């Protein structure tokens, strides 16, 4: 199995994705030519805070303004992501009013993520529609590059199973649940492995709000 051509959805296909795609296709063709059974697989990141960021920006400022062309729409989604990050980024010497506005925007974005995570029908539908816009562009780019995927895996398909695994790790004492104290679910890697020279490696496996990581 060769895994490649897997950009995040709601972001336009760019030169970095092209490099990865061409390299992956070259490796797939070489293994196939050498006589090996070859499966071309893509694992797009179609979930996470970056995806929710675009949904929030669209819903709040740009709903119904999307262009109709496949590639124009994909590039437009990327612009929404950039604009959203400008609004959400803390500015140097920002005024109290600007701080309050930025924090309000951040709270709205987090609330949308919470709603998605809780299965809110309207947020899930918006996610499905915009996700398909991004995938339409990706499929067309792959067609242009003469790349044909055999299987598609999506991050959203492993979101719920991964939460179940986290709960299992907590139950087994491998992960520490610090959410009651305002923290996240973490694994203290050095402590669990009995390493003494390095004591600072900690892996966050679930955010404090219960959402998963990339």
Language-model features: locations:
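NTP-dependent nucleotidyl-transfer catalytic core
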Residues: 1-214
